[in-house]
Amino acid sequence: MKSEELFTTAKTCLPGGVSSPVRAIKPYPFYVKSARGATLETEDGESLVDCCMGYGPLLLGHAHPAIQKAIEAQLDAGWLYGTPTKLEIDLAQRICRDHPSIEMLRCVSTGLEATLAAIRLARGFTGKCGIVKLEGGFHGAHDAVLIAAGSGATTHGTPDSLGVPPSFAAQTRQVPYNDPEALEELLSKDKEIAAFILEPVMGNVGPVLPDDGYLSAVREITKAHDVLLIFDEVITGYRVGIGGAQKKYGIKPDLTTLGKITGGGLPIGVFGGRRDIMELVSPSGGVYNAGTFNGNPLSMAAGIATNVYLHENESLYAELDEKTRAIEESLPAKASGSFVRLGSLFKYFFRSTAPRNYLEAKESDTAAFRVFFEKALKDGVFIPPSQFETNFLSTAHDASSMEKIISVYQHV
């Protein structure tokens, strides 16, 4: 079956024909039957250079031999026990070693679960209910953070989805990214805030990078107001380097969430942080968290294999940075947009200057992006189908795939 026919069938049994809205490419999505390295093979017989990489987890590319070997070995030993394993201890110790701010952690199954649990933990630890997030900040599709982007910086939240009770959404406040003054003003007025959760680098609208001094100001402000600081590093964790954005920018949050690369491309989420906070997690404390697939052996094995590989080949981060630099340098002189990159994350905004926050990112010409996306796909390069999703490179992007990508951006 070809993609168009598959989509017609999918709409009879899947809402909108897909399992996640971003995949609903118009007029119909292409369907992938296999992937290796940096290449997707579609049901239509096409080969595409992948600049999505599963929306971030595949730093080493599709079906990397070291990860595949670890998964196959664990399959032979069984893939779910319902008991503790040495694997979860091993991965936890590695993550704690890589992140000085993380003294204890809990492995869950998704980044969404990790942010949900971190917010619950912050509320339990502080005894306060309010949460602050960024305008446009995305932390998974759960009620505490599904709040409409762009509402006033110091107003209560408005539900961004049917089914979210307004009374629940009202516990969430928003401030703009790169605006420490707005955060200070809010926390000075509202003394019922448990935590401020943010992506240190906004990955779900860009990327959008922090101004010099912004993250350190956020750390000082939250400390001054006795508000916990949660870094959502589901995207940036192990993507911008071992130790994530918190190491790169020299910030020590109270809690951190991880996912994606941490599990080697298998389902995983992690929340961790200060020991005195984490000891409140059940069964040692009163903040409940549980899950059938928490710490599942397959994800632990893939995560360990990834961690080992990254430590043995840490120079790959500099090599990936050079690859995105090459894309940036390929842009034609007539290009009127802005190119933003950080290591292996990059995006071309159809906007004259790089955005500093979500509202500025929204000013991008989405119609022009759509034309660019469709041309790139026609030319054999798959980029995320939204102006507001980050592009990702992997170590598997070799000279041939880079040549294709650069050819696309030379004609932006």
Curated annotation (Swiss-Prot):
InterPro entries: 4pyrrol_synth_GluAld_NH2Trfase, Aminotrans_3, Aminotrans_3_PPA_site, PyrdxlP-dep_Trfase, PyrdxlP-dep_Trfase_major, PyrdxlP-dep_Trfase_small. Its EC number is 5.4.3.8. One of its GO terms (biological process) is protoporphyrinogen IX biosynthetic process. It is found in: Cytoplasm. GO terms for cellular component: cytoplasm. Disulfide bonds: none annotated. It comes from the Archaea. Keywords: Cytoplasm, Isomerase, Porphyrin biosynthesis, Pyridoxal phosphate. Its cofactor is pyridoxal 5'-phosphate. Its main location: cytoplasm. One of its GO terms (molecular function) is transaminase activity. Coiled coil: none annotated. The keyword Isomerase applies. The modification N6-(pyridoxal phosphate)lysine is found at K260. SUPFAM superfamilies: PLP-dependent transferases (SSF53383). Pathway: Porphyrin-containing compound metabolism; protoporphyrin-IX biosynthesis; 5-aminolevulinate from L-glutamyl-tRNA(Glu): step 2/2. It catalyses: (S)-4-amino-5-oxopentanoate = 5-aminolevulinate. Belongs to the class-III pyridoxal-phosphate-dependent aminotransferase family. HemL subfamily. This is Glutamate-1-semialdehyde 2,1-aminomutase. The lineage of its organism: Archaea, Methanobacteriati, Methanobacteriota, Stenosarchaea group, Methanomicrobia.
